[in-house]
């Protein structure tokens, strides 16, 4: 079995993996797992990264996995951020401003015990966003969030 590469920055991940991906926090590896959603490695984790920058994002929660968390009181992988990897950075580790035409930025959180959706700080459920930064401190920020309802 070949070891998966580890990346520090989103542009390293995008250059190596590219395309549509599904990302989730990997507690055991203290990083994000990046799963390919197209190409020959579709459905496989192809990299681990300390930060990820995504465009055209959808927030996905598998309700069956969430119910298992609630019943067993034990974590499992059931919530994901789907999007396209981006490389638009300023070379100093900061996102160029403006990368997109952003009207609103919110912090995004997910807690299976609070509700079945990713939410902003006001507990408004989110379906997706124009862009998302998943940073090395495991905080997530969405530009132009798309609220449910």
PLM features: what roles do these ranges have?
Residues 25-141:
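Acidic, low-complexity, intrinsically disordered interaction modules
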Residues 16-18, 103:
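A general secondary-structure signal for short beta-strands and their flanking turns/coil
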Residues 5-7, 19, 32:
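Short structural boundary motif marking the start of a folded domain
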Residues 1-4, 145-149:
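Short intrinsically disordered terminal tails
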């Amino acid at each position: 079995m070949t070891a998966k590469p580890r990346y520090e920055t989103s542009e390293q991940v995008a250059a190596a993996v590219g395309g549509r991906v599904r990302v989730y926090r990997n507690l055991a590896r203290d990083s994000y797992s990046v799963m390919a959603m197209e190409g020959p490695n579709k459905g496989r984790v192809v990299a681990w990264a300390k930060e990820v920058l995504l465009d055209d994002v959808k927030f996905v929660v598998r309700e069956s996995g969430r119910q298992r968390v609630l019943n067993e009181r034990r974590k499992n992988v059931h919530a994901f951020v789907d999007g396209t990897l981006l490389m638009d950075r300023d070379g100093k580790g900061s996102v160029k401003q403006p990368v997109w035409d952003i009207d609103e930025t919110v912090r995004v959180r997910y807690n299976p015990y609070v509700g079945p959706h990713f939410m902003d700080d006001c507990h408004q459920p989110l379906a997706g966003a124009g862009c998302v930064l998943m940073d090395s401190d495991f905080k997530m920020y969405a530009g132009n969030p798309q609220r449910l309802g």
